Amino acid sequence: VIIPVVRTLPRLEDTLVSVLEYGPDNCQVIVVLDQPYSDPYGLEGEITFIRAGEGLQLARALNLGCRAASGEWIHFLPCGNLVARNWAENALAHATDWRIGVIVPLTVDARDESRILAAGMGYDNAGRLVHLQRGVSLEGTTLAHRSRVLPHFSGAFFRRDTLLALGGADESLGDGWVLADVTLQFFRAGFVSVLEPTCVVRGDPALEPVGYDYAAARDAERFFWRWSDRRGSTILRHLALLTGQTLAALPRGQLWPHVAGRLAGWRGSAATGLVKNNGTLRSAIRQNTCDRSPPEASYIAKAG
């Protein structure tokens, strides 16, 4: 389990308690810190602390933790989120399926655990991440093992060797897009993801990345152009989304930072599009997972 602490240190001990209480035997726990931690309970030794320093972002934390880990699978669990009993065992029931590279937990609302915060995420190719089944009551709801779903911001399980072969997380991306980008890289390499409804994480909506400021707008635009199919209809839908979000930024006093961020993201990514070519990675990845070629698949997870 890799726990990144990015401006969330006061919540660390709650996350650790849930992991240590419900974690399987011999579970390796790695905490990547953005500020000093006094370790008042003397957990050093039982837990690996990586002191990455100020300015840490989720992508950097994922890469540091992944290199320090030793297991076949890692669970990237941002600090402030809490796991439930048997969460890891239920997720890793999929571990032997060579087609699966990402396992997505069901995230429930920590304020009301009878409500779904996200049964994974979808991606609207106009440039927007969409919470799946947000606000739906768990009572009377049957959740399937939905495939090709993106992770919520509360984290996911990844095949560690495959993630390393893909080059890790892109540290130029903002926190709100890192897990989606990593998962889409898995899709491009021929793997799928799966939602495991019995792997439950309690997430706080207050921890979800939001905003209309410069950085948020830049990161959103950069992600769009990285994964866009460049079709005319897609561009038109994206322009409609930009218009709506620009108008929404106006009453928040973020109009010009938002516009500047969008322009910066476009300049940085529009000319290059998909920056990673995974054609040379397939054989290396297969050596880590199976003797057969992974299935071909389009790589955009649809919303809805």
Residue ranges of each PLM-predicted region?
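Glycine-rich, basic loop-to-helix element that forms the pyrophosphate-binding segment
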Residues: 52-69, 79
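Short aromatic/hydrophobic "clamp" motif used to bind/position activated sugar donors
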Residues: 74
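Conserved donor NDP-sugar-binding/catalytic core segment of glycosyltransferases
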Residues: 82, 86-124
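Short, flexible, basic/aromatic active-site loop/helix in glycosyltransferases
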Residues: 124-149, 153
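Short, acidic, metal-binding catalytic loop of nucleotide-sugar glycosyltransferases
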Residues: 17-26
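Active-site donor/metal-binding and catalytic loop motifs
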Residues: 189-192, 196-211, 219-223
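Non-catalytic, C-terminal membrane-associated alpha-helical segments of glycosyltransferases
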Residues: 214-216, 229-304
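A short, conserved alpha-helix in the catalytic core of glycosyltransferases
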Residues: 91, 148-167, 172-200
